[in-house]
Amino acid sequence: MARYLHKASKQWHYPAVDTGDCGPEYIRNPDLSSVDGVPQHRWIVEGDSVRAPTTEETAAFDAADLEAAKLDKMAAIDARTAEIIAINGVIVNGVAISTSIAAQVSLNALEGLVRLGVATWPQEVSAANGGSYTINSQPDFVRVAGIMATFVTTTKAAGRALRAQVLACTTVEQVQAVEDSR
């Protein structure tokens, strides 16, 4: 049975009925002796023949693979950073206060009221368990906001440090070895 290699996608096509020609975008039963051991996505198709990449082409493939690995790893780090902030909380007086984006926005709004001099006390903020924590005074607010800001900024800083490690990598293997154990 004949098999056809698509010139652009480098994917195999096995027609149910072999007419001997699948069109100009396919190569029928190509000679693959020159690409033995070369990953299929790196094959170079020229006309109706397949060859291994040159040193320069291999370097370009390696650079593209490294860039893709870095982007994937940094996206995973960013997602983990957002997850840590959204799911976790900071403990204040035995209550886990939510550090979600919504909770941060609420504290920012309360800070705006404090700056305008129109804040009233007590104020409630969301707790991680679905309940609430009562802020009884401006000094208590400053303490809670400071604890939350420290948690969020240190979590983001840890993510940035991991991203810097990824950016410094020179091989895909080094990128894969960067571990986000937060």
Please describe what each predicted stretch is.
Residues 2-3, 7-39, 46-182:
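A preference for well-ordered globular domain cores
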